[in-house]
Amino acid sequence: MLENYKHTTVLLDEAVNGLNIRSGGIYIDGTFGRGGHSRLILSQLGPEGRLLAIDRDPQAIEAAKAIDDPRFSIIHGPFSAMAEYVAELGLTGQIDGVLLDLGVSSPQLDDPERGFSFMRDGPLDMRMDPTRGLSAAEWLMKAEADDIVWVLKTFGEERFAKRIARAIVERNRTEPMTRTKELAELIAAASPVREKHKHPATRSFQAIRIYINSELEEIERALEGALSVLAPQGRLSVISFHSLEDRIVKRFIRHQSRGPQVPAGLPLTEEQLRSQGGQTLKAVGKKLMPSEAEVAENPRARSSVLRFAERLPA
């Protein structure tokens, strides 16, 4: 079933090039997906190199079985636990690069049975790992209208959040929704105005998915984990797909790139400043966006943003 869903890796070469691969280095692909980035990293590693992949989606773990390479291993779990995985392997502070490709993957969106898409009818699930936590249907059934409003506004910036939340609660009182098509049609009916070229359920589905999977909290923990595992001069390469994700990545790199707060004019060397604490990363280059050619070939790439940072010596 996995092969039925094509996945085109976004910003493939750019994201891996930003890791500055060393042939004998140790790298982490924190979001294996269908292995596009992992395969390219492996192609650039020498026999002594090593790649650890992470994914919480059971289908991604199944897809990883196709990689028969002694340099490669994968862990089934959230990338937010990266620091713990690396500590168990005794590799804390020895990782030469971490790559994170955030958000939902094309196979997840395109498989109606996963319940992520408002364009294809399927069970109203939306979990990255269907074996854990509440499904979207279960959460919507028990949630109060105010809670739904908060989720739609916070994670989807949905201006008709109150109307949609009220419609969801009223519908679930009479006949609980269990299908994505039911929710998409309800949202469309509750939205008095439509954005041009955008389905009215786009923002709400994004918001519910982010909430169900604790995506933003997972990103924050993953970034902190990456910082703790990287070796000096180790690279962080992060692809985000919407403003909420990119804002977290941008703020994290900016915060970790700040020097210590000391009075101006003190005669301190760069090494002495770092010893005061506060500066652990430096941004590398400018953010990258996909080319027009890539967007034409893969329209889902259009909103992607790629940022890099480098670990500074302690």
UniProtKB/Swiss-Prot annotation:
Which UniProt keywords are given for this protein, alphabetically ordered? Cytoplasm, Methyltransferase, rRNA processing, S-adenosyl-L-methionine, Transferase
Q: Where does S-adenosyl-L-methionine bind?
A: G35, G36, H37, D55, F79, D101, Q108
Q: Which domain of life is it from?
A: Bacteria
Question: One GO term of the cellular component aspect?
Answer: cytoplasm
Q: Where in the cell is it found?
A: Cytoplasm
Q: Name one GO molecular function term.
A: rRNA (cytosine-N4-)-methyltransferase activity
Q: Identify this protein by name.
A: Ribosomal RNA small subunit methyltransferase H
* Role description: Specifically methylates the N4 position of cytidine in position 1402 (C1402) of 16S rRNA.
Provide the species name.
Pectobacterium carotovorum subsp. carotovorum (strain PC1)
Write the Enzyme Commission number(s) for this entry.
Answer: 2.1.1.199
Q: What is its main location?
A: cytoplasm
- Disulfide bond annotation, renumbered to this chain: none
Question: Does the record carry Cytoplasm as a key word?
Answer: yes
Catalysed reactions, as listed in the record: cytidine(1402) in 16S rRNA + S-adenosyl-L-methionine = N(4)-methylcytidine(1402) in 16S rRNA + S-adenosyl-L-homocysteine + H(+)
